[in-house]
Design a protein with these regions (language model features):
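Extended alpha-helical scaffolding segments used for macromolecular assembly and cargo binding
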Residues: 503-526
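Conserved NB-ARC/NACHT P-loop NTPase core of NLR-like innate immune receptors
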Residues: 1-497, 501-506
Length: 526
């Protein structure tokens, strides 16, 4: 029987069939649908992976360093010193600390450094697992997925440990639903302790963006659990285990690192504005502007622009405005490099913005970034509509975590839902966001299929979560929610939630009682 025969069928019944169970298959030759006739290794593998198959249901695929949602790594000519320092710390068998916390303000480049470390640790065969928290990404803001995701990666990084994890979960499939302390113990620590041969290389677990995890108490709890790991006698693989944690320097996170057990086993690195950071940002700018100048997308508009472009003085001015925050050059380069506009004109807009005094930058390092965000929003043709769409998307993404199973099932086009609930015409949302592509990622290609029985959505969009609309950086969300930073562009989440709730009630009156994708969407606000 072809194994794909029933792949796309549901509610299939087979009556009067005859099935033969083959326990012995000696002497079988040839191939069956491309699979070698000796099925023992395959059957053994299927049996072996029962526990891992259960565990995978609790894995946040987008949170891993190598997922399709992964963050960019550092430019190869930047952050060399800090990355080299951390790699040396990992590889030092005599190091006194087992936890490294590098922290910094929004936009300092923490995630890019963490991504680069993951890549290097994979090459060195040191990486056991990683988890990149994200407040507005599906399945990446909830700590319940943290240890199952890391454990699943660990099972493949160290196969002997993977066999133990598989057996443990197959014996007790409820482990991923238990308290985090039990998950850590059963899915990571005990399997590492049971390996017969102690690993000679470091075992590295990287947790990025802990401040993006839901709830201050949960963030503190995760840190306490990591600290408790090293209060126990080192056995087996745990002897070489180390954790790297990145976050903003939030007070409650900082407090955990100042008390035992973490205080005595943690090395801290702060990512602030230094001369080296400025040099790295200058390199980043130079490389990015060169790429824009030489891009085929700008061949006609840039062919007569002489290098170096822009001038060294302009780059120095932009470096000063960055105040050590890598998100600033990243946003500038996306804005200037937009293929729909002439790069020289876009750069002139930024250069002509009012200067910010050094004293203002000293007290408000994000002042230049805020000015840049405001400038980009001011260029939108329909400012109020743009803000409405932005805040509606923020509200829906904020509600996703409570309905993560439903969203994984239906995978709705959030932009079309926002248009409907805000009484806009189809396409108004895309048009409103067209001018701010440097701030918001809009998917270029969506695979769509008709949903004939749903009055809200005429189209159900089949895209992976990483292909959906997303904000390029969380600092833009912070800007929109802080009236002292965004001023006239500040958004009111409470007001928008009320508007969406009222629109949902009106819309749901037209639905049948069946659980369609649109009913799920509207139920977020009720």
């Amino acid at each position: 029987m072809n194994p794909t025969m029933f792949q796309y069928n549901r509610n299939v019944q087979v009556n009067g069939g005859a099935f033969t169970v083959v326990n012995e298959h000696k002497g079988m030759t040839g191939e069956l649908y491309g699979i070698r006739s000796d099925l023992k290794p395959i059957l053994s593998y299927i049996h072996l992976c029962k526990g891992l198959q259960i565990l995978h249901r609790w894995v946040s695929d987008g949170a891993a360093h190598d997922s399709a949602q992964h963050a960019p790594v550092c430019h190869p000519d930047t952050r060399k010193t800090i990355i080299g320092d951390i790699m040396s710390w990992i590889g030092d068998p005599s190091r006194k600390s087992s936890v490294l916390w590098f922290n910094g303000p929004a936009g300092a480049g923490k995630t890019a450094i963490a991504q680069s470390l993951c890549k290097l640790c994979v090459a060195a065969q040191w990486l056991a697992g990683s988890f990149f928290f994200s407040r507005h990404a599906l399945g990446r803001s909830n700590a319940e997925f943290l240890f199952p995701t890391i454990s699943f990666a660990l099972s493949y990084a160290i196969p002997d440990v993977g066999k133990i994890i598989d057996t443990v979960v197959a014996h007790d499939p409820s482990i991923p639903t238990k308290a985090l302390e039990i998950q850590l113990q059963k899915l990571i620590l005990e399997p590492l302790q049971q390996v017969t041969e102690e690993p000679k290389e470091p075992i590295v677990i990287i947790i990025d963006g802990l401040d993006e995890c839901e709830g201050e108490d949960m963030q503190s709890n995760v840190l306490r659990l990591l600290g408790s790991v090293f209060q126990r006698p080192s056995v087996g693989g745990c002897d070489r285990l180390c954790f790297i944690v990145t976050s903003r320097p939030e007070p409650w996170i900082h407090d955990e690192f100042t008390i035992e057990p973490l205080s005595s086993i943690t090395r801290q690195i702060f990512l602030g504005q230094t001369s080296e950071a400025n040099d790295d940002i200058r390199t980043f700018f130079r490389s990015g502007f060169t790429e824009i100048h030489d891009s085929p997308k700008h061949r006609l508009t840039m062919s007569n622009v002489e290098k170096p472009w822009p001038s060294y003085s302009v780059v120095d001015e932009l470096v000063d405005k960055a105040s050590g925050q890598f998100i600033y050059p990243a946003t500038v380069l996306r804005f200037v490099g937009d293929p729909n506009y002439r790069p020289t004109d876009r750069l002139d807009i930024l250069v002509s913005m009012p200067a910010i005094s050094p004293s203002a930058l000293a007290t408000k390092p994000l002042a230049a970034l805020d000015q840049l965000y405001s400038q980009i929003l001011s260029m939108s043709t329909h400012k109020h509509r743009t803000l409405d769409i932005l805040i509606a998307l923020m509200a829906m993404k904020e509600s996703m975590s409570a309905l993560h199973v439903a969203w994984r099932t239906f995978q709705l086009d959030l932009l079309r839902i926002a248009e409907k609930l805000l009484s806009l015409q189809p396409g108004d949302g895309s048009q409103a966001l067209r001018m701010i592509h440097s701030l918001v990622h809009i998917p270029g290609r969506l695979l769509m299929s008709d949903v004939a029985d749903d009055n809200l959505l005429h189209l159900e969009v089949q895209y992976r979560d990483e292909d959906g609309i997303r904000f390029h950086h969380k600092s833009f969300i912070d800007y929109l929610l802080d009236s002292s930073r965004s001023l006239e562009y500040c958004v009111d989440m409470g007001e928008m939630n009320a508007r969406l709730a009222l629109a949902s009630i009106v819309t749901m009156q037209t639905f049948s009682l069946r659980p369609t994708p649109s009913r799920i969407a509207c139920s977020m606000f009720l």
